[in-house]
Amino acid sequence: MADNYRSRIVTQGTQRSPNRAMLRAVGFGDEDFSKPIIGIANGFSTITPCNMGINDLAMRAEAATRLAGGMPQLFGTITISDGISMGTEGMKYSLVSREVIADSIETVCNGQSLDGVLAIGGCDKNMPGAMIAMARMNIPAIFVYGGTIKPGRYKDCDLTVVSSFEAVGQYSAGKISEEDLIGIERNACPGAGSCGGMFTANTMSSIFEAMGMSLPYSSTMAAEDAEKADSTEESAKVLVEAVRKQILPSQILTRKAFENAISVIMAVGGSTNAVLHLLAISRTIGVELSIDDFETIRQRVPVICDLKPSGRYVTVDLHKAGGIPQVMKILLVNGLLHGDALTISGQTIAEILADIPDQPPSGQDVIRPFSNPVYKEGHLAILKGNLATEGAVAKISGVKTPVITGPARVFESEETCLEAILAGKIQAGDVVVVRYEGPVGGPGMREMLAPTSAIIGAGLGDSVGLITDGRFSGGTYGMVVGHVAPEAAVGGTIALVEEGDQITIDARQRLLSLNVSEEELTRRRNHWQPRPPRYKTGILGKFAKLVSSSSLGALTDLNLF
């Protein structure tokens, strides 16, 4: 039986002669019409270093697909550079781009009846966008990560792009010179690849490897190293075989796979954005997963990797120390991973990890032994309270002050907040509130990397809290709480906070509280009026109209009918 399970509707029979005529124009011959047609979703772009090396990988995937017996068809999908748009109106399009990427891949693959898809991406939303599409379509699929950037270097210190964000705060606080500010800027991003710490892109690529949708070791390879291209070729071969065997995302993206992913997130100290994206992917594939599952798993999985933003090392260091397979093997032997979960190769997680040592290699401290973790519990805490009845996400790694109670400093946008920080108007003990930045209110749920980096750069990271209904970059750390739900735009309690109100952030008790009486909150709620939408047309208008709560993954196709 031929392996073109879906594409035969386009390639077979007398009625499809015109269809075949067009396929002949793009390189098909008589012998090719019975082969599986494999889509290669190419996220190449010179907009960002994260994606500028991807075209070469797409060419390698195309050639390898042919050699494996498939017929490749390349098509483009978009990217937004989170780092370049950060702190601007453009950042409102970042989370929106996740949905656009998913829609575009689904549209091409289903519109052309493709038999499988290999997606290649680099910047943050490329990964969840591709995975949402794969979950929607449920056709054999594999993800190829474009690779991580190598660290920059300045004055004997390793740099990432976050170093440059923090340098802005340091310079504004008089802690570094303009020469150092520009020196860091010039050296932070030395070439191709996604931001180098365990930020969002590297977190999501690690998740896909842990879930079995990418090949072992592929998530931590440097973009510019030869092994990345070799891994891409192998990914294409594996995908063609998966089409033949009909290994589907629904067989891989199970409840066990999501639990494995959360365990790995905690172990590597991954980004808060993983919570949002995994909730979205799980709902798309039909797996029951809630924000509370992250808290349950957090309490039993230690952080065993010392990685930036709060740690010392970058992702290429993790790769040299054994990568995600080494992390997963440590979790597996300690009963924190489901070894029977299936992967796109047809092997189980346990089979893939069989030859990996139980202990991390000696002579390095990027990956710690299970008995000597960086932190005894996971770092992504789910906070609840009257300020976040649906929940909020806090990254508590590296936090020296786990409990803060202080006066609210209220800002209606990221820009006004950043201006106040750089002007020295935020003091130790303050709790900064940035609202109307949620999925609906932004719209688009911008990341607050500029304000949080400015707080760190000013030396206030241990003494100032920040809460928002927006998101945080994977490069953020400190006493910060994001994804506050319900958001301000739909009448969440965060909309009722007034300047000077006392707010408590308690990481130990997982509590986020506005210390105002219920009677006063009721009075304020009765006077609250929703704000008119900032955008009434275009993609931001559509997003604001359709998007769900961040506690449900901020999807645009949830409960449409």
UniProtKB/Swiss-Prot annotation:
Q: Where does Mg(2+) bind?
A: 82, 124-125, 447
Q: Which residues carry this modification: N6-carboxylysine?
A: 125
User: What's the cofactor?
Assistant: [2Fe-2S] cluster; Mg(2+)
- Which biological processes are named by the entry's GO terms? isoleucine biosynthetic process; L-valine biosynthetic process
Taxonomically, which superkingdom?
Bacteria
Q: What is its pathway?
A: Amino-acid biosynthesis; L-isoleucine biosynthesis; L-isoleucine from 2-oxobutanoate: step 3/4; Amino-acid biosynthesis; L-valine biosynthesis; L-valine from pyruvate: step 3/4
What is the main EC category here? Answer: lyase
The family database entries (Pfam families) matched by this protein are listed as: ILV_EDD_C (PF24877), ILVD_EDD_N (PF00920)
Q: How is the cofactor bound?
A: Binds 1 [2Fe-2S] cluster per subunit. This cluster acts as a Lewis acid cofactor.
Q: Cross-referenced SUPFAM superfamilies, in alphabetical order?
A: IlvD/EDD N-terminal domain-like, LeuD/IlvD-like
The record's EC number reads 4.2.1.9
Listed binding positions for [2Fe-2S] cluster are: 50, 123, 195
InterPro entries, per this entry? DHAD_IlvD/Edd (IPR050165), Dihydro-acid_dehy_C (IPR042096), DihydroxyA_deHydtase (IPR004404), DiOHA_6PGluconate_deHydtase_CS (IPR020558), ILV_EDD_C (IPR056740), ILV_EDD_N (IPR000581), IlvD/EDD_N (IPR037237)
Any one GO molecular-function label of the UniProt entry: dihydroxy-acid dehydratase activity
Q: Give the residues annotated as active site.
A: 473
Q: What are the protein's UniProt keywords?
A: 2Fe-2S, Amino-acid biosynthesis, Branched-chain amino acid biosynthesis, Iron, Iron-sulfur, Lyase, Magnesium, Metal-binding
This molecule's function is given as:
Functions in the biosynthesis of branched-chain amino acids. Catalyzes the dehydration of (2R,3R)-2,3-dihydroxy-3-methylpentanoate (2,3-dihydroxy-3-methylvalerate) into 2-oxo-3-methylpentanoate (2-oxo-3-methylvalerate) and of (2R)-2,3-dihydroxy-3-methylbutanoate (2,3-dihydroxyisovalerate) into 2-oxo-3-methylbutanoate (2-oxoisovalerate), the penultimate precursor to L-isoleucine and L-valine, respectively.
Q: Which HAMAP family match?
A: IlvD (MF_00012)
**Its family?**
Belongs to the IlvD/Edd family.
The record, for NCBIfam families, names: ilvD, PRK00911.1
Q: What is this protein called?
A: Dihydroxy-acid dehydratase
**Species in which this protein is naturally found:** Microcystis aeruginosa (strain NIES-843 / IAM M-2473)
